[in-house]
UniProtKB/Swiss-Prot annotation:
Highest taxon listed in the record's lineage: Bacteria
Keyword Ribonucleoprotein: yes
Gene3D superfamilies in UniProt: 3.30.230.10
One GO cellular component term noted in the UniProt record for this chain: cytosolic small ribosomal subunit
The species this protein was found in: Pseudoalteromonas atlantica (strain T6c / ATCC BAA-1087)
One GO biological process term: translation
Top-level taxonomy: Bacteria, Pseudomonadati, Pseudomonadota, Gammaproteobacteria, Alteromonadales
Protein name, as recorded: Small ribosomal subunit protein uS9
Length: 130
């Protein structure tokens, strides 16, 4: 652990990701498993790689990620947010390009709670006129 590492916490829905960025060759390890093994869906893998591809540093860093909570989509979004924060800690000049792509902003959308008297959060029971 002599080499420097950069850290970023990412959140999305109910998922939280801790991302450690170290100089390396582009290996991404999520919960002690390779990225391709952890995420079965290609879209999730693509979401995770987006910030690195934007700043053209895919082969420059090794990433060690721990992620907990939520599902596949939320975890992928949380990892992307964490990578973005770690990249900004590494080099603050990357912030404008990452902000323009929309990776810096925490996606605040959460599942809306179910209300009493309704079937779901907003779905009402069928209305009968007579």
């Amino acid at each position: 652990m002599a080499d420097t590492q950069y850290y970023g916490t990412g959140r999305r829905k109910s998922s939280t990701a801790r991302v450690f960025l170290r100089a390396g060759s582009g290996n991404i390890v999520v919960n002690k498993r390779p990225l391709d093994e952890f995420f079965g869906r290609e879209t999730a893998r693509m979401i995770v790689r987006q910030p690195l591809e934007l700043v053209e540093m895919t082969e420059k860093f090794d990433l060690y990620v721990t992620v907990a909570g939520g599902g596949i989509s939320g975890q992928a979004g949380a990892i992307r947010h964490g990578i973005t924060r770690a990249l900004m800690e590494f080099d603050e000049t990357l912030r404008p390009s990452l902000r323009k792509a929309g990776f810096v902003t925490r996606d605040a959308r959460k599942v809306e709670r179910k209300k009493v008297g309704l079937h779901k959060a907003r779905k009402r029971p069928q209305f009968s006129k007579r």
